């Protein structure tokens, strides 16, 4: 069974003074409010789509002046910062093997691999000798890659059920990629709200800033924006994303 999943994180810090979309009546499956830590089961429930993720909206980018705004692209704004590039990365074949405390600022990731973001970790892990460092690339255009039945409420059985032994996911039931990097907020962003934008994460992720739990997002290929203003500090900040295949 040849199946593939692509993970790509395209990230940007977007600083703006516009109001939070969370003030509107949220869509079903979106929830808001302070939560100290995830339960670890959010990725198994189709009823829970997001925590503290901004409501879907058109692309919004602030600019410092009209001339910059006429150039349209966000990189022409001093209130936009890209987080694309090398991130510290750890690959685990299943959720139980993941480094559970990696989001804590005191957790040492200096020995981790670097991985370019955005990228597919499966493809990036293909070595020159043909060996696979980060799991098996899976290609499929319609069937789901985990064991299931077409039946009402079958989702309650979860994605970790044992599939046939000839399935690629028999060995790597649900891979987890742990991503971390540092960033700094420009001084002239003081007094503004700061949002982080993920332009596509497949298929689920938790987010922490400076060791504090921000929320989670499903819906792999849609943009996920979070207001991270309350979690920021002056100087170096740490962003951590835990991605489930």
Regions from the language model: what does each represent?
Residues 1-3:
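Short, Lys/Arg-enriched N-terminal segments with co-localized hydrophobic residues
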